[in-house]
């Protein structure tokens, strides 16, 4: 009996040291899956150099315009429908109408205008805001939004160009996420941390070509262990997640948002 007991003890001790099979991250996320997503664009001008925004802030909202397609605040909302996937919410506008920025300098500072603050809000099935779930409990270390223009074509009065399919020639984007995530630097209650920890719940975007239509592919990356690129030791650019990053994670969100860049700011300044 002693030998049998010893054998069983060794058997169970051996089993307890077997390699632990990692959980499937797609089935065991530490956050809910969103059921609604709202993207808000706020047209702004700058009180700081574009290249300093991630340190000091600077975008200020422009006053409202009576023009139909020149709303200073625009929102697009998608909802997850059973059996249908993501669908445009009832009553939501379907496209963003924006302007190509003009290149301006103020007291030696590069202050292109307009630029657009872009906020993303996620809601769970109960309708509760759930942005914090992508931040808390270390989730900020494995989540990052990517923004990639696709399906580019000229508007009715535009012309195709050779570099239309180069994302960085169409848009420029800066991560301006804050810590805490739901406070602002302007209120002196938060610091901008988007450069050192890009998430993309808050950002500022500008459009570099006029008379273009495209889909802005918005993807929320969920890394299995990290969102950093192990080959470069840095974060991938906003428009291009690397192949190795894609292999080491999944997408929490993958949606196309239609954008129309109907004219240039310089055409409206006389």
Language-model features, listed with the residues they occupy:
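N-terminal edge beta-strand
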Residues: 68-109
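Short beta-strand elements
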Residues: 57-66, 231-270
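Exposed beta-sheet edge/beta-hairpin loop segments within beta-rich domains
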Residues: 102-116, 134, 181-217, 222-232, ...
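Short amphipathic, basic-aromatic surface patches that mediate peripheral association
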Residues: 19-28, 45-47, 124-134
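Bacterial Sec-dependent N-terminal signal peptides
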Residues: 9-39
């Amino acid at each position: 009996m002693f030998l049998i007991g010893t054998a069983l003890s060794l058997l169970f001790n051996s089993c307890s040291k077997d390699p632990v099979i990692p959980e499937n991250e797609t089935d065991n996320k530490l956050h809910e899956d969103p059921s609604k997503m709202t993207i808000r664009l706020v047209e702004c001008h700058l009180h700081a150099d574009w290249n300093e925004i991630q340190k000091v802030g600077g975008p200020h909202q422009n006053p409202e315009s009576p023009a139909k397609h020149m709303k200073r605040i625009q929102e697009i909302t998608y909802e997850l429908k059973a059996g249908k996937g993501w669908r445009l919410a009832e009553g939501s506008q379907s496209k963003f109408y924006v302007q190509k920025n003009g290149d301006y300098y103020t007291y030696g500072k590069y202050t292109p205008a307009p630029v657009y603050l872009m906020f993303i809000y996620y809601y769970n099935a109960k309708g509760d805001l759930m942005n914090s779930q992508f931040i808390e409990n270390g989730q900020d270390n494995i989540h990052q939004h990517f923004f990639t223009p696709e399906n580019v074509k000229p508007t009715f009065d535009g012309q195709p160009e050779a570099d239309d399919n180069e994302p960085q020639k169409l848009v420029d984007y800066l991560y301006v996420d804050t810590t805490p995530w739901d406070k602002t630097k302007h209120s002196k209650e938060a610091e901008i941390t988007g450069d050192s920890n890009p998430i993309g719940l808050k950002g500022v975007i500008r459009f570099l070509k006029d008379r273009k239509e495209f889909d802005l592919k918005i993807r929320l990356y969920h890394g299995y262990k990290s969102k950093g690129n192990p080959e470069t030791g840095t974060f991938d650019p906003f428009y291009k997640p690397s192949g190795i990053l894609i292999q080491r994670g999944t997408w929490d969100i993958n949606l196309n948002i239609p954008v129309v860049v109907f004219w240039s700011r310089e055409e409206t300044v006389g």
